[in-house]
A protein has these predicted regions:
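Conserved glycine-rich cofactor-binding loop
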Residues: 103-104
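Conserved glycine-rich Rossmann-like NAD(P)H-binding loop of the short-chain dehydrogenase/reductase
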Residues: 117-133
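Substrate-binding pocket helix/loop in short-chain dehydrogenase/reductase
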Residues: 183-184, 191-196, 278, 289
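Active-site helix of classical SDR
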Residues: 207, 243, 251
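Alpha-helical segment proximal to the catalytic Tyr-Lys
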Residues: 212, 256-257, 317
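Residue(s) in the substrate-gating loop at a strand-loop-helix junction
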Residues: 227
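Short, small/polar-rich loop/turn modules that mediate ligand/substrate recognition or access, typified
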Residues: 259, 264, 319-321
């Protein structure tokens, strides 16, 4: 009996279908009606309200979802805008490169390679002012600065001048180095210390000077030039091998420390490269060394320079803490 009474009440409510034309007329307000009419039970008979009763959650969020999707699009762009800021440094003409030991050999070849790629170039030289002047003359706009990398004061002075002239140092190539062939038992403490000061401590000085600006700009490339003897050790070149091995260790550790700041640190460890540092070798010595090289010849400075140029580019942005070398580059 009571159930029949309920049925009578439902029969009385069909009067409300009269407002249904109103709900049908405003097709657009249907979502709003759906949000307000899930309360009355009279709408279950009509399929539209049943759907809207099942869709109250999807429908209201549908609009905010679209709006929120639009908002993130703006915020994403806003978050991406700061990233392109360092990307502005990715254009080669906007970059400045400082190369130590840039007056001859691998350093001079690197200066030419970076210059031809559109970089602003500054090189450091120690005593060969004539070679430095010739490099400046052949590369208009290139700057050559005298510097003994073993001296912290000299590095600070030269780096400040380079930064003023270049605008900023985005790429640092630590290439300055000396070599000496001598039995380990004959090496003097002064010779040992001088080898470390030039080949290892010089890189320490320049890296410390270059890093603050790179960290501030969240972008930078540090490249060190070691040697295969730093990887395998060379007889009669123990102090040289030790210094070059230290340079590889510096590279790997610094890469871990500076990676979060957008700075990569890599090392090139060339094999036997035919530069003026091999002036003391006889043709027979060079031929013997060439036979020990997998490709059967000595390397040249331009090949090493191209490796450095690659590591400085965006294409190598995911490469860090690596040493390219072993037998040869």
């Amino acid at each position: 009996m009571h159930e029949e009474d309920f049925e009578l009440t439902f029969d009385l409510e069909p009067l409300e279908p009269a407002p249904q034309p109103k709900a049908a007329a405003p097709a657009v307000p249907v979502p709003r009606a759906a949000a307000s009419q899930p309360r009355p039970p009279a709408e279950p008979p009509t399929p539209a309200p049943v759907k809207t009763a099942a869709q109250p959650h999807p429908v209201p969020p549908a609009r905010p979802a679209a709006q929120e999707a639009a908002r993130p699009a703006v915020s994403v762009r806003e978050t991406e805008k700061p990233r392109p800021a360092p990307a502005a440094h990715t254009a080669a003409p906007a970059r400045g490169v400082l190369i130590s030991g840039g007056d001859r050999g691998i350093g001079a070849a690197a200066a030419r390679a970076f210059y031809e790629a559109g970089y602003r170039v500054a090189v450091l030289y120690h005593t060969n002012a004539q070679a430095a002047a010739a490099l400046e003359a052949s590369l208009p706009g290139c700057i050559a600065l005298q510097c003994d990398v073993a001296s912290r004061a000299a590095c600070e002075s030269a780096f400040t001048a380079a930064e003023i002239m270049l605008g900023h140092v985005d790429v640092l190539v630590c290439n300055a180095g000396i070599a000496q062939q001598k039995l380990f038992t004959d090496i003097t403490p002064a010779e040992w210390q001088h080898m470390l000061d030039v080949n290892l401590t010089g890189a320490f000085h320049l890296c410390q000077l270059a890093l603050p600006g790179m960290i501030r700009r969240k972008w930078g490339r540090i490249l060190t030039v070691s040697s295969m003897w730093g990887q395998t050790g060379g007889s009669c070149e123990v102090h040289y091998s030790a210094a070059k091995a230290g340079l590889i260790g510096l590279t790997k550790a610094l890469a871990r420390e500076e990676g979060p700041s957008g700075i990569t640190v890599n090392c090139v460890a060339p094999g036997v490269i035919d530069t003026d540092m091999m002036a003391a070798f006889t043709p027979g010595d060079k031929a013997a060394l060439a036979e020990e090289t997998p490709v059967g010849r000595l390397g040249n400075a331009q090949e090493v320079a191209r490796a450095l140029l690659f590591l400085a580019g965006e294409e190598a942005g995911y490469i860090t803490g690596q040493e390219i070398g072993r037998a040869h580059v």
